[in-house]
Design a protein with these regions (language model features):
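Transmembrane alpha-helical segments that form core, pore/gating elements
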Residues: 51, 109-110, 148-209, 213-217, ...
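Specific transmembrane alpha-helical segments of multi-pass solute transporters/efflux pumps
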Residues: 18, 22-23, 52-102, 138, ...
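Glycine-/small-residue-enriched transmembrane alpha-helix faces in small-molecule transporters
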Residues: 1-42, 149-175, 195-199, 313
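Hydrophobic/aromatic residues within transmembrane alpha-helices
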Residues: 29, 39, 43, 89, ...
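C-terminal-most transmembrane helix of multi-pass membrane proteins
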Residues: 1, 44, 141-142, 232-234, ...
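Juxtamembrane helix-entry segments on the extracytoplasmic side of multipass membrane proteins
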Residues: 4-8, 33-37, 41, 63-69, ...
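Helix-helix packing/entry segments at the starts of transmembrane helices
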Residues: 41-42, 79, 83, 97-104, ...
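Hydrophobic transmembrane alpha-helices of multi-pass small-molecule transport proteins
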Residues: 51-52, 72, 112, 121-143, ...
Length: 313
């Protein structure tokens, strides 16, 4: 593994670590402190301000028009639309279902990459993807608890749409990611996302029969009437700074160095990370499935990387 590949793997591990931490945090935010639309708007706005500030401190980078279109459209699909689906999914179902469905992301990416950018599906690559899915599913299933969400069927459907749109983003922005800095890409991604996230959120509200379809919703978030806003503000700060700015900085950084399928395999780290953190803070116990799941996910990433570097891959 050369230095660029190592940097790509390290970046995507960091990104999926914070993404794994963000699932229970988002679940708490959209069920207690924000509406899904309010959550997405403030998340987009915060990330936009930070990325444009960072861009102002860096040398200006010119983006070709066709590449800018790919970045903007891909970003709107991969962030504004995908994460809105995710926020609504977590408002209707439990994080465990969401984590289970997220393990299907590498399959979606592999199939889309084969269909649209002619990335071959080799036997070794398929085996690697399946090993990673097995590792993540092992831990999710072993940690299954009773109880249901508000509407699990609807939540699961929205989670599937979230993973599909995220997979589309990984595939269509793969080549462009190698041409421009992550900050340049993300400043346009989040500016476009901030513009469309509320209209798309209103569309979701109207379709789901939830929330208020006007700007007054942003002025009436549950957080504003809480006796102490500190916890909700701290959680939102974590989502904006770590799960959005840091996480989405490292994704294009990684995609410039390793294939989209390899990037997607690391999605299976998210439930592993969530479980490790729960154990560390005393909310869970260490059982045999957790280290086994972690080893399987890392083995999966190694196999897919080896397969991608073969001449016929």
């Amino acid at each position: 593994m050369n230095q660029r590949n190592f940097q790509g793997h390290a970046a995507v591990i960091v990104a999926n670590t914070v993404f794994g931490l963000s699932v229970p945090v988002t679940n708490d935010l959209v069920n207690h402190h924000f509406t899904p639309n309010g959550y997405m708007f403030f998340r987009c706005l915060g990330a936009t301000l930070i990325f444009w500030l960072l861009a102002a401190l860096m040398p200006k980078e010119k983006v070709e028009r066709k590449d800018l279109l790919i970045i903007v459209v891909g970003g709107m699909v991969g962030f504004a639309i995908s994460q809105t689906f995710a926020a609504w999914a977590l408002a209707f179902t439990q994080p465990v279902y969401f984590s289970l469905l997220a393990t299907l992301t590498p399959i979606a990416v592999m199939l889309l990459a084969a269909a649209f950018i002619n990335e071959k599906i080799t036997g070794l690559k398929a085996v690697g993807v399946l090993i990673g899915i097995a590792g993540a599913m092992l831990m999710v299933v072993m940690g299954w608890t009773s109880g249901t969400g508000k509407n699990d069927l609807l939540g699961i459907s929205l989670a599937l749409l979230s993973l599909l749109t995220w997979a589309i983003y990984l595939v269509i922005t793969g080549k462009v990611s190698a041409k421009y800095s992550a900050v340049t890409q993300m400043k346009w991604v989040f500016l476009a996302s901030t513009i469309i996230v509320i209209p798309f959120g209103w569309l979701m509200s109207a379709m789901l029969g939830e929330g208020t379809v006007n700007y007054s919703e942003l002025l009436c978030q549950p957080l504003y009437t809480e006796p102490s806003m500190l916890w909700g503000v701290a959680e939102m700060a974590f989502i904006i700074i770590f799960a959005t700015v840091l996480g989405f900085f490292f994704i294009p950084y990684a995609m410039a160095r390793i294939p989209a399928t390899t990037v997607s395999v690391y999605t299976n780290l998210q439930p592993v990370v969530a479980s490790v953190v729960a154990f560390a803070i005393g909310q869970d116990v260490l059982t045999w499935d957790k280290p086994v799941a972690g080893v399987l996910v890392l083995l999966s990433a190694y196999i897919v990387t080896v397969a991608a570097n073969r001449p016929n891959a």
